[in-house]
């Protein structure tokens, strides 16, 4: 009840602001268009180091596929308030949003800039660090994925960076240390939006220069610590998610495996990414959104966890990384946090 009341108050406050602000009205008329933002904003690629706790643990709270449209609706505000409540309750070391934070822009009251600003300001108020990777919807209209990343980069607690001269809206890594030693790293990869050049307008795929960046980044981490492991956060799946659905084993007996429904989402052109991850011997987790399952899904396949978080309107996932584990199977705990 408290969450609903707070959401109603937030909607009322937003409407009052709208009615009293000509600038906000004009922004809504433009649908919050941020096109070209990436060309006018220079943002730092320096990201803070993180540290595991005394037990070697690091926690990630993963949200995905919120599909916010306006922040003037009760649905949007209720979901945002639930995210805030969970962030406060579980106090993760890092929040990760794996794409489709914003809908495609076809809603009549859509305002891209207002949504981005509202989400970012919530995390600023909480002083909560969070990482973001784009999904296939974030860059469809009124600003590309690179514009979204540039807009969010203005906020101190939003950890986004874009490697120069690499395709996509962002590619970056965040390192976890145990004292002075690099003990784990997290990679964040833009799996690209819809491929508008394709006659069927299907999902895009990770391009060769992005794949090469991933390989180089993992090798850089291994040069610092040959025993380092890597977790990967992305929006869309690689073909090994489908193989994990067919041949993998369940994380826990009560935790659903990745389903073969992924076959209809299969993106064969993402195979080079799987090849790099498998050849490295250092990747322990791929965690995605996109698929909108009814519950979280997880399969362990050939040394790697393949995890799918449901839409945040249903649940988030609390991931505990045991950075001092000596094998990938015992390195992770997953917990569904229902809304």
Regions found by a protein language model. Give the residues of each.
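Bacterial Sec-dependent signal peptides at the C-terminal "C-region" and cleavage site
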Residues: 8, 12-26
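N-terminal active-site segment of His-dependent metallophosphoesterases
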Residues: 22-113, 118
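Extended active-site neighborhood of metal-dependent phosphoesterases/phosphodiesterases
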Residues: 24-49, 114-225, 316-318
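Binuclear metal-dependent phosphoesterase catalytic core
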Residues: 24-41, 47-49, 173-179, 273-280, ...
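Active-site-proximal beta-strand elements of phosphoester/diester hydrolases
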Residues: 57-70, 183-193, 233, 305-311
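Active-site environment of divalent metal-dependent phosphoester hydrolases
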Residues: 69-72, 103-106, 132-144, 194-197, ...
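Metal-dependent catalytic neighborhoods of phosphoester/phosphodiester hydrolases
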Residues: 73-75, 99-121, 139-158, 244, ...
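His/acidic metal-ligating clusters that form di-metal
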Residues: 90-93, 185-188, 200-295
């Amino acid at each position: 009840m408290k969450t609903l009341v707070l959401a109603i108050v937030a909607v009322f406050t937003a409407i009052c602001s709208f009615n009293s602000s000509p600038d906000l009205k004009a922004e809504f008329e433009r649908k919050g268009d941020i096109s070209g933002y990436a060309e006018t904003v220079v943002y730092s690629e320096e990201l803070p180091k993180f540290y595991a706790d005394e037990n070697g643990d690091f926690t990630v709270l993963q949200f995905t596929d919120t599909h916010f449209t306006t922040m003037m609706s009760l649905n949007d505000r209720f979901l945002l308030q639930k995210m805030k409540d969970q962030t406060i309750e579980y106090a993760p070391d890092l929040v990760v949003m794996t794409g489709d934070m914003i809908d495609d822009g076809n809603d009549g009251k859509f305002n891209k800039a207002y949504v981005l600003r509202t989400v970012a300001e919530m995390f600023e108020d909480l002083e909560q660090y969070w990482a973001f990777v784009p999904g296939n919807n974030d860059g469809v209209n009124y600003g590309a994925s690179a514009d979204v990343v540039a807009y969010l980069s203005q906020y101190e607690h939003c950890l986004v960076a874009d490697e120069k001269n690499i395709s996509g809206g962002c590619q970056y890594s965040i390192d976890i240390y145990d004292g002075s030693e690099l003990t784990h790293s997290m990679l964040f990869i833009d799996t690209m939006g819809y491929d508008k050049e394709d006659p069927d307008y299907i999902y895009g795929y990770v391009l060769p220069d992005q794949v090469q960046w991933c390989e180089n980044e993992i090798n850089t981490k291994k040069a610092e610590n040959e025993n380092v492991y890597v977790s990967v956060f992305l929006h869309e799946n690689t073909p090994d998610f489908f193989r994990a659905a067919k041949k993998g084993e369940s994380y826990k007996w009560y935790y659903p495996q990745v389903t073969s429904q992924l076959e209809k989402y299969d993106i064969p052109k993402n195979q080079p990414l799987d090849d790099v991850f498998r050849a490295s011997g250092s990747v322990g987790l791929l965690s995605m959104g996109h698929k909108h399952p009814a519950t979280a899904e997880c399969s362990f396949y050939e040394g790697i966890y393949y995890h799918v978080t449901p839409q945040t309107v249903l649940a988030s996932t609390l991931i505990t990384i045991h950075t001092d584990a000596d094998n990938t199977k015992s390195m992770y705990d997953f917990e569904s946090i229902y809304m």
